[in-house]
């Protein structure tokens, strides 16, 4: 049995949710209604996120990238956490509902590209189109967009110890099949509603401390 860590990006590795930051800065007012319908689960994540990005003109590409580089902050303790994970030969994957055009640049030099799974974007038309290279498998019918639970099944063994780290509704299905959940913000609410055991965290120092203890117990 090996330990596999599956970590969200927006609002988890970064302090802010980059998709929401983009929408607040660049999207028209109707984005707010779409966002609320995603959070209430009235819209699937795939439907909602597609609709959100269809509100953003592609000619804002460079401006959006510059905005995120200036405003996105990596959560405290993440660098040390990754060092600890690497030193202990723990498998680590970023499974993000975010977009390639900002996830890859913000993680450059921290996480190898082959350990990052995110959505793809097309800027060839007037508005941004989202492509979904990691859809739900036959065991999930939630139209997740990037299906985190399907990726966990694809990347790991059923005998592995699965750790999920996340903050929002997009992490709920993954949390349902995890052996250990680190949660913050809205994911805490969803875990409690679904009776999922979780450990709250604010920084990756918290996660590292708990993971270190877990390794000691398992060894």
From Swiss-Prot:
Pathway: Amino-acid biosynthesis; L-methionine biosynthesis via salvage pathway; L-methionine from S-methyl-5-thio-alpha-D-ribose 1-phosphate: step 4/6. Its EC number is 3.1.3.87. GO terms for molecular function: 2-hydroxy-3-keto-5-methylthiopentenyl-1-phosphate phosphatase activity. Keywords: Amino-acid biosynthesis, Hydrolase, Methionine biosynthesis. InterPro entries: HAD-like_hydrolase_phosphatase (IPR050849), HAD-like_sf (IPR036412), HAD-SF_hydro_IB_MtnX (IPR017718), HAD_hydro_PyrdxlP_Pase-like (IPR006384), HAD_sf (IPR023214). It holds the Pfam family HAD. The keyword Hydrolase applies. Belongs to the HAD-like hydrolase superfamily. MtnX family. Dephosphorylates 2-hydroxy-3-keto-5-methylthiopentenyl-1-phosphate (HK-MTPenyl-1-P) yielding 1,2-dihydroxy-3-keto-5-methylthiopentene (DHK-MTPene). Transmembrane segments: none annotated. It catalyses: 2-hydroxy-5-methylsulfanyl-3-oxopent-1-enyl phosphate + H2O = 1,2-dihydroxy-5-(methylsulfanyl)pent-1-en-3-one + phosphate. The keyword Amino-acid biosynthesis applies. It comes from Bacillus anthracis. It is an enzyme of class 3 (hydrolase). This is 2-hydroxy-3-keto-5-methylthiopentenyl-1-phosphate phosphatase. GO terms for biological process: L-methionine salvage from methylthioadenosine.
